[in-house]
Amino acid sequence: MVKFICYPKCTTCQKARKWLDDNKIEYEFRDIKLNNPTLDELKEWHKKSGLPLKKFFNTSGLLYKSLDLKNKLPTMTDDDMLKLLATDGMLVKRPLLIGDDFVLVGFKEGDWSAKVIK
């Protein structure tokens, strides 16, 4: 079973959840605001995703903008970025879909289909 991590009020997350339900994909739901990802989880997900760490940031979020992360991220180390992401789930791009051997960040139907539809 995959883990589906999102913010329920996010419209992209709502579309992703509907897609999972419509395709009868079993998932474990987790509200990213109520249950913030831990530093260890973020390290594991980053490694498993193969993506640059900057892709894990919710660049359209108010918190990202208020912290001026657009200008700060280029000078931060991966450790500093991971620690920052672990402080608030609203900094993390969502939804996240996590399987045994993959992590998908954001909702792209084609990518999700390739990973979970048999």
Feature names for model-found ranges:
Residues 1-23, 27-32:
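Local sequence-structure signature of Cys/Sec-based thiol-disulfide redox active-site neighborhoods
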Residues 34-118:
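Thiol/selenol-based redox catalytic cores and closely related redox-interacting motifs
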